[in-house]
Swiss-Prot record:
Superkingdom of this protein's organism: Archaea
Disulfide bond positions: none
SUPFAM superfamilies named among the record's database cross-references: Ta0600-like (SSF158436)
Gene source species: Sulfolobus acidocaldarius (strain ATCC 33909 / DSM 639 / JCM 8929 / NBRC 15157 / NCIMB 11770)
Similarity comment: family membership: Belongs to the UPF0147 family.
Protein name (database record): UPF0147 protein Saci_0891
Length: 89
């Protein structure tokens, strides 16, 4: 049960970090949209935490190579991906 709580805490923290990206108007719209999609995946309670994290990682890794992304946003996305990679069932 403790692992599930830890996973949910990591997911909540990742959602919070992604929410900052979504609310940052200096970030291009397509990147904010991808962050919103990742949040939506992370909040889908019908899936296990690891599957939700993997889905979000896929979205974020795809967008992380965008040349228009500000450097601070890229670093934030890498931090979120690193955190989500530790989520396991």
């Amino acid at each position: 049960m403790s692992a599930l709580y830890d996973n949910e805490a990591k997911i909540r923290q990742a959602v919070g970090m992604l929410q900052k990206i979504v609310n940052d108007t200096s970030v291009p719209r397509n990147i904010r949209r991808a962050a919103t999609d990742a949040i939506r995946n992370l909040q889908d309670q019908t899936l296990s935490p690891a599957v939700r994290a993997a889905n979000a990682i896929g979205i974020l890794e795809e967008i992380s190579q965008d040349p228009n992304m500000p450097m601070h946003t890229r670093i934030a996305i890498w931090n979120v991906v690193s955190m989500l990679e530790t989520v396991k069932d």
